[in-house]
Amino acid sequence: MAQWWLILLGLWTVLPSLAGGKLLNVCMNSKHHKQEPGPEDKLYFECMPWKDNACCTRDTSWEAHLDEPLLFNFSMTHCGLLTPLCHKHFIQAICFYECSPNLGPWIQPVVPNRQEEQRLWDVPLCLEDCEEWWKDCRTSHTCKADWLHGWVWDQGKNGCPAHAPCLPFSDYFPTPADLCEKIWNNTFKASPERRNSGRCLQKWFEPTHGNPNVEVALHFAGSASAPQLSYSITAFSLCLLLHA
């Protein structure tokens, strides 16, 4: 019987890391993502932080920098040009979404129980990321808080719905959290944690300082796998007791 308890102890030790590993260093199953992350030494400007290990290609990184990114067939100039600083935040957010291999814990199927296409859900952006994005965009204009749904499409281009006036971002997004969480329909979540806390993700970082999101993904991958593993190993433990 002692040998079974040794095996059980080993399971408690090893399985969490194995299960969490499935959520690490992965790419989404999505239109523009590579199947596996890897080096891409010719990524454009704001996508460069991921050049050593990226889920995006050079072409994807180039398209992310356009005023009307071909990636989503979506015009960010529906209420006129964004300010340069505001536009830069959106480029960084698109690069983060397309290039990061550290988003595994937040990947969800678009259709429940099917993995043909995936999306991100509640990615915890650091407090400073949301605050700076909101501050630099509050004087730019938009006509909607949800940029994923409810547009009027004409000749393949998105336009504002009737009775949806172009107003400063701050009218549609009164707080930094509103901007982070509403604009792409809960793709991001405004975290109360700060950068370098190990508990939130940065949508951009200095490449020379290393990727801080690796540690964060590791933490959340372990947290995500813990409940299911605990249930499975507890059930196995009860079986051992019943047959002792």
From Swiss-Prot:
Cystine pairs: 27-55, 47-95, 56-99, 79-166, 86-137, 126-200, 130-180, 143-160
GO terms assigned for molecular function: protein binding involved in heterotypic cell-cell adhesion; signaling receptor activity; signaling receptor binding
Region called Important for interaction with IZUMO1, residue ranges: 62-81
Superkingdom of the source species: Eukaryota
Post-translational modification: The protein is rapidly cleaved following fertilization, being only weakly detectable in zona-intact fertilized eggs at telophase II and undetectable at the pronuclear stage. Sheding is probably required to block to polyspermy and ensuring egg fusion with a single sperm.
Residue numbers covered by the propeptide annotation in the UniProt entry: 223-244
Cellular component, GO annotation: external side of plasma membrane; microvillus membrane; plasma membrane
Signal peptide boundaries: 1-19
Assigned keywords, A-Z: Cell membrane, Cell projection, Disulfide bond, Fertilization, Glycoprotein, GPI-anchor, Lipoprotein, Membrane, Receptor, Signal
Membrane topology label: Lipid-anchor; GPI-anchor
Tissue specificity: Expressed in the oocyte (at protein level).
InterPro entries in UniProt: Folate_rcpt (IPR004269), Folate_rcpt-like (IPR018143)
GO BP: cell adhesion; fusion of sperm to egg plasma membrane involved in single fertilization; single fertilization; sperm-egg recognition
Subcellular location: Cell membrane; Cell projection, Microvillus membrane
Glycosylation sites recorded in the entry for this protein: 73
Function statement: Receptor for IZUMO1 present at the cell surface of oocytes (oolemma), which is essential for species-specific gamete recognition and fertilization. The IZUMO1:IZUMO1R/JUNO interaction is a necessary adhesion event between sperm and egg that is required for fertilization but is not sufficient for cell fusion. The ligand-receptor interaction probably does not act as a membrane 'fusogen'. Does not bind folate.
Subunit structure: Monomer. Interacts with IZUMO1; the interaction is direct. IZUMO1 and IZUMO1R/JUNO form a complex with 1:1 stoichiometry. Interacts with FCRL3/MAIA; FCRL3/MAIA replaces IZUMO1R/JUNO as IZUMO1 receptor after sperm-egg adhesion, thereby permitting species-specific gamete fusion. Interacts with WDR54.
Family: Belongs to the folate receptor family.
Protein name (record): Sperm-egg fusion protein Juno
Gene: Izumo1r
